[in-house]
Structure formats: structure tokens, C-alpha cells
Amino acid sequence: MAKVNLIESPYSLLQLKGIGPKKIEVLQQLNIHTVEDLVLYLPTRYEDNTVIDLNQAEDQSNVTIEGQVYTAPVVAFFGRNKSKLTVHLMVNNIAVKCIFFNQPYLKKKIELNQTITVKGKWNRVKQEITGNRVFFNSQGTQTQENADVQLEPVYRIKEGIKQKQIRDQIRQALNDVTIHEWLTDELREKYKLETLDFTLNTLHHPKSKEDLLRARRTYAFTELFLFELRMQWLNRLEKSSDEAIEIDYDLDQVKSFIDRLPFELTEAQKSSVNEIFRDLKAPIRMHRLLQGDVGSGKTVVAAICMYALKTAGYQSALMVPTEILAEQHAESLMALFGDSMNVALLTGSVKGKKRKILLEQLENGTIDCLIGTHALIQDDVIFHNVGLVITDEQHRFGVNQRQLLREKGAMTNVLFMTATPIPRTLAISVFGEMDVSSIKQLPKGRKPIITTWAKHEQYDKVLMQMTSELKKGRQAYVICPLIESSEHLEDVQNVVALYESLQQYYGVSRVGLLHGKLSADEKDEVMQKFSNHEIDVLVSTTVVEVGVNVPNATFMMIYDADRFGLSTLHQLRGRVGRSDQQSYCVLIASPKTETGIERMTIMTQTTDGFELSERDLEMRGPGDFFGVKQSGLPDFLVANLVEDYRMLEVARDEAAELIQSGVFFENTYQHLRHFVEENLLHRSFD
């Protein structure tokens, strides 16, 4: 089948007026290869040139005024090739002096009694405007040439093309293309949406703010609807090929294992276990996300599920992003299982004869549970009969890596875990095809971490507070954003310098250093020393963000904390507060921006990771929350997953109804179905 386009053009880009081979090269750099691409190349923002009442204008603000010329323009030259043009306008009975620097050619264009529109900076005291643009209009109404002066689209461009050129070329294209509707009449009427023809023309050349809002609303819904059609269709395909054997676990053995645990499960943990167990009994493969705040006990839930698989005669696999985390999981699971399960660890460090023996035991079924890094997805890693694959911090792996691990078993159930609570907005889009379990309770006995914010000049006081904790026999983390000093970030502390400073303060043997440039063995050695309390203070970059578990650590200092996002700060903070002892987190920062100040304030107000994740998403946007590449998020042109969340829910419901009812596969939707299938369905956002 040929590629289906919903925007069809009778000619190519080269046939547009003003586009030659050189312009084609520039357009291609902007990812514009066809006339359809050009029409869908939307503005990034709009210059608001709406004429305002000068009585309402703020001093030193950028304004647009319209008035009648009542003095002839005068040009004064000074310096080398510099000029100043002065002209006076009458604007609603207010005499305004207009100044234009280095635009002497305007003298020939500005005439007495002419009505012109000027955009520039307003000086209320002097009653003058320093103009940067002028629009000519002798009739007192906007000419066709300046019809879009009120709301002027601004595009992302590169050297070799100007704003006016791309606006003109898009206008040309819109005049001649055939635009097929993406939404049905029924949907448009139901939600009071515009036609795609009106929407695209308005987004490129808005006649009013009201029209622009209507067009933006329609295009945002269209983007979300097409995305959800893709998600729902993939979900249907996934489930149609997702036959699975029912995991016939021994419930009595599982209950006995839970009773032997040295602690009582929280209600949230029990609920999550029950949800997962229902999935394991179902005739289709499980796709579930288990999300919980730092220290909420996700690993225990995973352990119970692994044990259930063992009682049914199946193996389990747990893939984590780092060797340190893999080793910690292996250690904690071995302690939980004792002799009841054979747990093995496979990382890049396991080599030679040891690796060969491990792989043999895995293939013959001797190993019940395999824990490791991406080493688990290598071709020679063959399971006997894996029934459950668990991926921890799954957004840190690419889709391909997760798929390769899943394919280790023909009918494998999949559980994703994350300690980064995912805002419901992202959960519905990134993980739309999954069921979600959430653990929002902390284990009994845990005390909330006390978080404070200190400026750099208060560092000595923070050091005294940390010393007080160390004297109690506790341990501490000190986090820095950089490994070494940077000439570009001279005001940012680096981990090596702070490590050396703290060595002088506490003594060489009491302070350890951890960062990404160390080898795996070096990292393991440092972490082992910290875990064994051979060192008191661990100075580190964010490599300790995920999974590191040292219950005796009760103090964390995060230097230049404003350099991190809320989710990262919360993950770092979660390295303390892992026992019944009171823990502290001190943010050292002197933020220069409102956003930085807001982040520090929020961190001191709440320890709820779910609330923080929502705030982080609002502040940073979905693309930065995980990074578009990792998250699988499409790069929407108009829609915003935060602002348009309600619209996303509606789009999802409408798409689900179309797909699940089968109506989408009838002739009525043939054109749209072919478009989604050819352009979106198998497109990867990795």
C-alpha cells in the first residue's frame, strides 16, 4: 500500500515560488521535505501586535500603537553609518514622539497625515516610543500585506531563510493543497471542533485571538486523538497475540512465605500483590507498572511474585539499570528467600568460567531467579522456563532492551517497577497500554525526612549539623552536580574538590568518593565500604540516585541543589530515611531564578513523591521529565500533556471506543485507518 497522506499537494516544494535548490537544503535542515511537511510546520509562538490604548500601557513595556503622522520625519546621522529618525504621531489625542535608530530609509516611506502602526518600547515619562517596526496603512485599516500584523506567527528558522519567506511559502501551499479531514463530522460536532482546513489556515495566519484558540484546541485534540488511536490499536494487537499460560501458584506456600517476613506488609503492598496475582491467573500476559515512592517496599512485592512463580515451577528475571543496584537487589532477595529459592546475579562483571556455569544452571532450571543489568538480554542468556520478567526503573531502558528481555520466554508476564512516581498524565500516555499499581504508603515506623534549605554562606552551619549526626554513629551522603571543575560552570561545586575538603575536615579514612568515571569494581568497593560503615561520609554525584540502601545513613547534604529537578532531588533524598531513626536532608543553594527558588521551597514543603512528580511535570514539561527519547513520548506540536490533560482523557476514551467496538475497522474510517497504519502505528518514538 502506498503511503497515505491526509494533506495532498499537486506539486513539489521546488515548484513553490521562491524555493530553489539552496532553499530546499535549508528546509530539509528543518525537517521539511514535502509540501505536507511545510503545511504542518507550525509556528513556535506569535508576536502580539494588537494596537493598545496608551493610557493602559506600562512604562518601558513593548507596545503597538496606531496614529497619524503630524510632522515630517527628520533624520540625524552620527558615528559611522548610524542614524536616528524622529517623527511625531497623534495617537488618540496624545502626541507621541517616535524614534527609529538605523532605519533612515523610512524617511521616504513616512508621509504627513499618513496613518501608521508602530511597534516598540514605550517611555511614559517622555511620551515617546523607540520603534523597531512600522506598518504602513494610508487607509486607516490594515492592508492585505499586513493582514496578519495583529498576531504574527514566528517559526523556528535557520540561516538562509527569513520569517517572511517561510510565511509566504506556507500561504502559497495552503492555497493549493487538498486537506482531508482527520476527524469525523460526529466527533467535530460532539466537541465543537473546527475543520482541519480552518485549523491549519488559522494556526499559520490567525485573524483573531479567538480564532487562534479555537484552532489550537482542535489541533491539540487531533494530535492526542491520533496518538491514542495508535496506542489503543497497538494495545489491541498486543492482547490479541498475548496468550499466556495461567501461573498456578501455591497460595498456601505464598502465604507461609509472607508470614515469615520480618515485617508486616502495608495495605498498599497487599493491594499491589493481589492485583499482580490476578494478572498472573489471567489467560493473557501481564503488562503492569508497579510504582511507589522511595522506600515504599516495591522490592518486597516483587519478591512475593517471584516466590509465587517458583511454587508454580517457573523462573523469574529482574533487570536493573546499574551493577550497584543489581548487587543490592541480589543481596536483599537472597536474605529474604534464604534457602527457599536459588538467586543468581548476572552483570557485565561476571565472566569466564563463573559465567558459563551460571548460564548452564539458568538453562537447566537450577536457578529460580536471575538478577542483573542489560547483560540479561544477551543472546547466550537462555532460560529454562521464565514466567515473569521484572524491569526496575524501566524508563532508563530503551523499548528494544525491554522487548528483548521479554522475548526470553514465549508467554512471559511483564512487571515494570519505578521509584519515580509517574504523574497520572504521563501514566495515561506513556504507559497507556499497561495497568498501574501504586504504593503510596511507607512501611510502619518510618519517620518523614526533615528537609531544610540553606544558602551557600550557611555551609559551615550545615557541616556542624552533619558532624552532630556522625557523632551519633550515623553516616552521611554529600551530593554534587559535577565530577570535576568546569570553566563553563565556575560557580558550581564539583565532587572532587568537596571530597578533598571533607577529607581535610574529617580525616582521609572517613570520607569516600563515588562518581560515574570510576570503574564498576571501584564503585563496588566504595559502596561496600560505606555499607559496612568503614567510611562515614560518601561524597557522590547522582549515581546514588536510585536503589542504594544504607539504613544507617541519616543525613544528606545536596550541594548546588537548584541544579537538579524535583524528581532527582526526591530520589536523592530517598537514600536516607530508610530506618526508624530521624533523617535529615539539607539543600544548599543560592538560586538565581524564580524556578530554582520554587523548587527549593517545594522540596521543604512535602516528602510525597507523587505530589512532587506532578509539580515537576508542570515546571519542566513532559519531554524533560524522563527525556523524550527514554519516555516514548511523542513530540506534540500543539498539545501539552499538562495543560490538555482533560482533553487527553477524552481523546483516549473516544479512541478506545472506536477500536474496541470495531467501528474503526469499517469503511467509514478507511482513510484515517490507512493513515494511522502507514504513518503512526509502527513508528517508534525511541
From Swiss-Prot:
Top-level enzyme category = isomerase
Q: Looking at the record's lineage, which domain of life comes first?
A: Bacteria
Q: Name one GO molecular function term.
A: DNA binding
**Which gene name does the record give?**
recG
Task: Using the UniProt annotation, give all residue ranges assigned to the region (Wedge domain).
Answer: 50-149
Biological process, per Gene Ontology: DNA recombination; DNA repair
Keywords of the record, alphabetical order, are: ATP-binding, DNA damage, DNA recombination, DNA repair, DNA-binding, Helicase, Hydrolase, Isomerase, Nucleotide-binding
Query: Pfam families, per this entry?
Result: DEAD (PF00270), Helicase_C (PF00271), RecG_dom3_C (PF19833), RecG_wedge (PF17191)
Helicase C-terminal domain residues are: 462-618
Q: Give residue numbers for sequence motif DEAH box.
A: 392-395
Q: Which family does it belong to?
A: Belongs to the helicase family. RecG subfamily.
Mind telling me which SUPFAM superfamilies this protein's record contains? Nucleic acid-binding proteins (SSF50249), P-loop containing nucleoside triphosphate hydrolases (SSF52540)
EC number, UniProt record? 5.6.2.4
Instruction: State how it assembles.
Output: Monomer.
- What are the binding positions for ATP in this chain? G292, D293, V294, G295, S296, G297, K298, T299
InterPro entries given in the database record? ATP-dep_DNA_helicase_RecG, DEAD/DEAH_box_helicase_dom, Helicase_ATP-bd, Helicase_C-like, NA-bd_OB-fold, P-loop_NTPase, RecG/Mfd, RecG_dom3_C
The Swiss-Prot or TrEMBL note on domains reads:
The wedge domain within the N-terminus inserts into the replication fork junction, where the lagging and leading strand split.
Residue stretches making up the Helicase ATP-binding domain? 279-439
Reaction catalysed by this enzyme: Couples ATP hydrolysis with the unwinding of duplex DNA by translocating in the 3'-5' direction; ATP + H2O = ADP + phosphate + H(+)
Q: What does this protein do?
A: Plays a critical role in recombination and DNA repair. Helps process Holliday junction intermediates to mature products by catalyzing branch migration. Has replication fork regression activity, unwinds stalled or blocked replication forks to make a HJ that can be resolved. Has a DNA unwinding activity characteristic of a DNA helicase with 3'-5' polarity.
Q: Which residues cross the membrane?
A: none
- NCBIfam families attached here? PRK10917.1-3 (NF008165), PRK10917.2-2 (NF008168), recG (TIGR00643)
Q: What is the protein name stated in its UniProt record?
A: ATP-dependent DNA helicase RecG
